[in-house]
């Protein structure tokens, strides 16, 4: 997925 700062979004 992609990580930006404190937010992490898994690839779905």
Curated annotation (Swiss-Prot):
Keywords: Amidation, Neuropeptide, Secreted. It is found in: Secreted. The keyword Secreted applies. Its main location: secreted. GO terms for cellular component: extracellular region. Coiled coil: none annotated. Pfam families: Periviscerokin (PF08259). The modification Valine amide is found at residue 12. GO terms for biological process: neuropeptide signaling pathway. InterPro entries: Periviscerokinin (IPR013231). It comes from the Eukaryota. Belongs to the periviscerokinin family. Myoactive peptide; has excitatory actions on the hyperneural muscle. This is Periviscerokinin-2. It comes from Periplaneta americana.
